[in-house]
Amino acid sequence: MNIHEYQAKALLRSYGAPVSDGRVVLKADEAKSAAGELGGPLWVVKAQIHAGGRGKGKFKEPEAGEKGGVRLAKSVGEAAELAKQMLGRTLVTHQTGPAGKQVNRIYIEEGSDIARELYLALLVDRGTSRISFVVSTEGGMDIEEVAASTPEKIVSFSVDPASGLSDFHGRRVAFALGLEGAQVKQCVQLVKNLYRAFVEKDMEMLEINPLIVMTDGNLKVLDAKVGFDNNALYRQSDVMALRDETEEDPKELAASKFDLNYIALDGEIGCMVNGAGLAMATMDIIKLYGAEPANFLDVGGGATKEKVTEAFKIITSDPNVKGILVNIFGGIMRCDIIAEGIIAAVKEVGLQVPLVVRLEGTNVEKGKEIIANSGLNVIAGDNLSDAAQKIVKAVKG
């Protein structure tokens, strides 16, 4: 789960991280009073969406102006006008895709005198099963660009959970960032605070880009992006309260309410599978035979007829889907239950695209019989390879 920048900064402030004072604006008529509560003489007006690249982004609507989603104002009135221009408009960045995201919140904060821009992130390293620090002197730009053009400017290391975080980790970050004197001490404390927030709040990723050195020599968190482990949200009620469902894919949101693991992709063949490994294998074989999967969808091991029906509704709500492949290996899940769910779903949604079903495992013969006697136009797949070839042929011709 992701949160907005202003929420991330409030959270980090509660852990002692140095951040600028700011106000969130939900309505245009709130902007002037919000900016007036801040000191100035410079105000930064930021569009709040769950995507990076806001500063370099462009709004679809001409009324929003030609600049991106991060703008500078030199007066309270100008800050209010900029907020009014951006609220309700659609911001397109390299992370939103061409559709963009509607800006429903604006964050106005005090400007900062910047001497240097740095990069600091914490993330879960799947390879080592540890929390890793990623730091670079090249802050203020996409870390992917730095990794591609000047990888030597990125330093990363992990923290052994057995011994935990120590001061030397903070000093290592400070020296990698070229800090010196009192800045090193500041950095050590900041690293401690960020690490504690990361662990206590079950974060998956904490990115500060940029972390700035101000002209007075002090450090400040200028932008923050935080992602949380969905599997740990049950014990993070305060984090759950920060969730903004308007920023989430409607299909993924609907799937989460039925405990379906769904991720939207860009292809044309919808997939419904039980088990993450089998789902990935199904997507791979679709690509092998020349097509692209439209989604990852794992219905899990205990799917009911209602759950299968909901899965079909989610898949067919994607206008890019030209065909559907159902691939079920019945272990805990019975193939006859899946078959009943498929029939009910096809009848309810009025399926207009080709459907290939491959069943194997518990009660497979019952499942195949239910589908065969349904009178519906469902193509049977003998095995995974056969099913994949049939759906690709049905879609591609």
UniProtKB/Swiss-Prot annotation:
One of its GO terms (biological process) is tricarboxylic acid cycle. Mg(2+) binds at residues 209, 223. Keywords: ATP-binding, Ligase, Magnesium, Metal-binding, Nucleotide-binding, Tricarboxylic acid cycle. Its cofactor is Mg(2+). Binds 1 Mg(2+) ion per subunit. Pfam families: ATP-grasp_2 (PF08442), Ligase_CoA (PF00549). InterPro entries: ATP-grasp, ATP-grasp_succ-CoA_synth-type, ATP_grasp_subdomain_1, Succ-CoA_synthase_bsu_CS, SUCC_ACL_C, Succ_CoA_ligase-like_bsu, Succinyl-CoA_synth-like. Substrate binds at residues 274, 331-333. One of its GO terms (molecular function) is succinate-CoA ligase (ADP-forming) activity. GO terms for cellular component: cytosol; succinate-CoA ligase complex. Succinyl-CoA synthetase functions in the citric acid cycle (TCA), coupling the hydrolysis of succinyl-CoA to the synthesis of either ATP or GTP and thus represents the only step of substrate-level phosphorylation in the TCA. The beta subunit provides nucleotide specificity of the enzyme and binds the substrate succinate, while the binding sites for coenzyme A and phosphate are found in the alpha subunit. Belongs to the succinate/malate CoA ligase beta subunit family. This is Succinate--CoA ligase [ADP-forming] subunit beta. It comes from Cereibacter sphaeroides (strain ATCC 17023 / DSM 158 / JCM 6121 / CCUG 31486 / LMG 2827 / NBRC 12203 / NCIMB 8253 / ATH 2.4.1.) (Rhodobacter sphaeroides). The gene is sucC.
